[in-house]
Structures are given as C-alpha cells and as structure tokens.
C-alpha cells in the first residue's frame, strides 16, 4: 500500500477569473461590462498591432497602444501612462505575450486599473503577481497582487500563428515556471501536483506542435500546461533559474523565453543533489531517467537555442552576470556558489550539456 505524507503548508488561491476555450475572445465585451468598463486601452506590440485593432474594433471608445517591448522598459510605461490620461481609459486589455502583459501589469501597478489579458504565447505571466521592469539597464522584479489581471481569456485560436521557434521557447519558459515551483521553499502539495501536470502536458504538446504546428489539440494542451505552470509560479517564490534569466535578459537585452530555454537544464542540474524529490517529479513527467538530461534532450529535439552566445550575450559579460546573480539571490535549494555558478554560466554560454558536478 502506498503511503503519503503531508506536512504543514500555506495555499493561497489566485483571484483571477480564467476563461478557457477556442473562440473565447468573443467574451471580451461581456467581461468589460461585468467590470463596469467602457473605455479600454488595448496594449500590444508592433508586430501584433493587427490583433489589437481587431480587438478594439467593436468598441467605440477603445484606444490602442502598440509599443510594448521586452523587459518592460520604464520609458515605454511612461508613454502608455500618458495615453491612459489622454483617453481617460478605465481599464487595460493586453493581447500578446510577455511584453504586452508586462506593460499591462506595469500600468495596473501605477493606476489600479482593471486588466483583461488574452495571451498569445505560453509565458504564463498573466496568472502571476510578479512584474519585472527595466530601469537604468537593470531589470528589477517585485511581487504584488496589484498587478494580477482580473480576467484571463485563453483562446487557443490566438496561438495558432505563433511561429514554431517562439512556440518552443515559450513552452520551455512555461516548463521552467513549473520546475521551480517543485523545489520552491514555500511549495505546497497543490502547486506540486499542478507543476508536474504542467511539465507533462507541455512535454507532450511541444513535440506535437513541432510536427503539426496548427494542431488545435496540441496548442490547447500547451496552453493548459502554460496556465498551470504560470499559476504555480504565481503561488510560490522564484528560485535561481528565474534570477539568472532576469539578470541576463535585463542586462544584455536577451530574448526572455529563449534565455529560459537555454538556462533551464543547467540550473536543474545545479540543484539536483539538493532537491531530489523535485528531480523525481520532473523525470516522471518527462518519462526520462533524470531531470536535467531530459530537459536538455527535449530542448535539443525541438530545435531550441542551447547557448547564450547564440542569443547575443558576450563572453566577457559572464563576470558581470555572476556578480549580479550573487547579489540578493532568490531562495534556492542549493546556495549560490560563485565557482559552481561560473562553470554553469560558461557551459551555458558555450552550449554544452548540463553537468551536476562542480
């Protein structure tokens, strides 16, 4: 007979309303009315401006801001705040990935306006109370319920045009959320179950997307996994992996999802001996012998980037990155050790497989 042990824990459910299903972007009007809003500012990126325009079309008093960009630069937030003042917007609707959602959160932080978010990637930011903003060349992250969207609409049809390379990187980013939830200091049985399900769902969906990129079933499963992974991250603290990715992205302007894709297996290998139960859960979800090799092999099989050099990070930047990572490091199963982290960053820069030994 299998025995189970449950220790003391704290579980706080997130307050966002989640709507999931194909075609559910049609619910935006009803959700606006439910929130008592009529003048939305729709935020998106330049590349997804047409999606924003289509979303704005039915609303007489909607306005559009399409300058969202990576890592939520404060200068962009200031311009969007000016647009809110000019149009007297009473809510924010974000359509897009982490750039659009990050800007929406930044606006909510400054204004307390309600948010409706329609994700088009698997980043998961839409269900976390976490915001990262870049000022003076450094990305700073904080956790506050003020940035949680009131409504999240997962419409799988919005992900069908997501290019394969971005689908892969974004999906691995979502897996990273779930992985870190499994060894978070404040983890609990609920988030651990959700995290393992997220990893398993994404590990099944991403190869299917790589084979048939317009598969509704595969895209739906990936979106489901991304929701679970993001939700886990929203409920527990971030670890070393997210600290490193925020440092690398904010300092060297590296693409967010791709940086996660490169670093994930390396950080898991770094933490392996200190988090054996998490390693077992990850390997079980991946159907592999060990967690770090399974994650590396998955990324490699999907054609994901494997080196920081390929993303544009200079080798000379490793020292500066290490200094920033060691400063105010997040809670992590294994304490940050400068020598071991340097070796890890060097291997990640070169695109070598992860290694558990110092």
Language model features with spans:
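ATP/NTP phosphate-donor binding region
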Residues: 1-90, 308
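C-terminal charged capping/lid subdomain of soluble metabolic enzymes
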Residues: 5, 285-358
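A glycine/threonine-rich phosphate-anchoring loop and its flanking beta-alpha core
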Residues: 16, 109-190, 198, 278-281
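Short glycine/serine/threonine-rich phosphate/pyrophosphate-binding segments
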Residues: 25-29, 48-52, 74, 99-106, ...
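A short, small-residue-rich loop immediately preceding and capping a beta-strand
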Residues: 84-107, 111-122, 244
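Active-site segments that bind and position negatively charged phosphate/pyrophosphate groups
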Residues: 185-294
């Amino acid at each position: 007979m299998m025995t189970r042990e449950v220790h003391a824990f704290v579980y706080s459910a997130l307050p966002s309303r989640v709507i999931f299903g194909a075609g559910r972007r049609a619910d935006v009007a009803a959700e606006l009315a439910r929130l008592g809003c009529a003048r939305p500012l729709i935020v998106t990126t330049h590349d997804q401006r047409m999606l924003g325009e289509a979303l704005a079309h039915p609303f007489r008093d909607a306005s559009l801001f399409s300058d969202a960009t990576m890592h939520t630069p404060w200068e962009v937030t200031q311009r969007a705040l000016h647009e809110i003042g000019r149009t007297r917007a009473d809510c924010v609707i974000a359509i897009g990935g982490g750039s659009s959602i990050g800007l929406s959160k930044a606006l909510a932080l400054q204004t307390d306006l309600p948010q409706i978010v329609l994700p088009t990637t698997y980043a998961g930011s839409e269900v976390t109370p976490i915001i990262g903003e870049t000022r003076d060349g450094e990305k700073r992250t904080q956790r506050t319920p003020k940035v949680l969207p009131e409504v999240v609409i997962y419409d799988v049809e919005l992900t069908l045009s997501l290019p394969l390379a971005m689908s892969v990187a974004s999906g691995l980013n979502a897996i990273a959320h779930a992985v870190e939830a499994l060894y978070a200091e404040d983890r609990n049985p609920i988030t651990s179950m959700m995290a393992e399900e997220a990893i398993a769902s994404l590990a099944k969906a991403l190869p299917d997307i790589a084979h048939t990129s317009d598969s509704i079933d595969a895209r739906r499963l990936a979106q489901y996994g991304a929701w679970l992974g993001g939700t886990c991250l929203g409920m527990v603290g971030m670890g070393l992996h997210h600290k490193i990715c925020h440092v690398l992205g904010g300092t060297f302007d590296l693409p967010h999802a791709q940086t996660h894709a490169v670093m994930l297996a390396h950080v898991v290998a770094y933490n392996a001996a200190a988090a054996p139960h998490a390693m077992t859960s990850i390997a079980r979800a991946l159907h592999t012998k060990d967690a770090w090799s399974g994650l590396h092999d998955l990324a490699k099989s999907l054609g994901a980037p494997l080196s920081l050099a390929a993303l544009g990070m200079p080798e000379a930047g490793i020292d500066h990155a290490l200094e920033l990572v060691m400063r105010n490091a997040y809670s992590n199963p294994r304490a940050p050790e400068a020598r071991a982290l340097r070796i890890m960053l060097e291997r990640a820069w070169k695109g070598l497989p992860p290694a558990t030994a110092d």
